[in-house]
Amino acid sequence: MPDLQYMCNMDWAEKYRPQHLDEILGNAAAVKQMALWAQTWTADSAPLLLIGKPGIGKTSAALALARDMNWEVLELNASDARTKAVIERIAGNSASTASLFGASRKMVIIDEADNLEGNADRGGARAIADLLKTAKQPVLLIANDAYGVSDSIRRICETVQFNIGYTISFILI
């Protein structure tokens, strides 16, 4: 039974976040491309780069994909220090070792990959490019602006475009 007090205090977006890919409305081609990438993933597969406007569902789709695949998640975003040392220590270890919790794989999610500049992320873009070349686990990057992502990172990745669209659903009674 879910923890009702926890659910009552949850942020609306978290409370209603899609838990599985089939719960995502819109961006059917992007969702299909993500699922195919995950189902055929090998250690030689390119990392996935999700591109799209803020709030369109990229992070929700990434988390739903991990849940569908029973993959443990390590998420790094702009609120985390993403220096070279931190990326090598945390993400590097996760991308090259097996899961501790029985999940078949660990997916490293690097959110806001188009914001890897400045003092807080010193050396981060280079460390991520190195990580992507050596990862033995699935790595997924998320960005609002494809051209804000370092060219050395963008060249390595398979890109998935999320577009703003309108979904109209009809319920037949």
Where are these regions (language model features)?
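Conserved phosphate-handling catalytic cores of large alpha/beta enzymes
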Residues: 171-173
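P-loop/Walker A NTP-binding region and its immediately flanking N-terminal helices
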Residues: 2-166
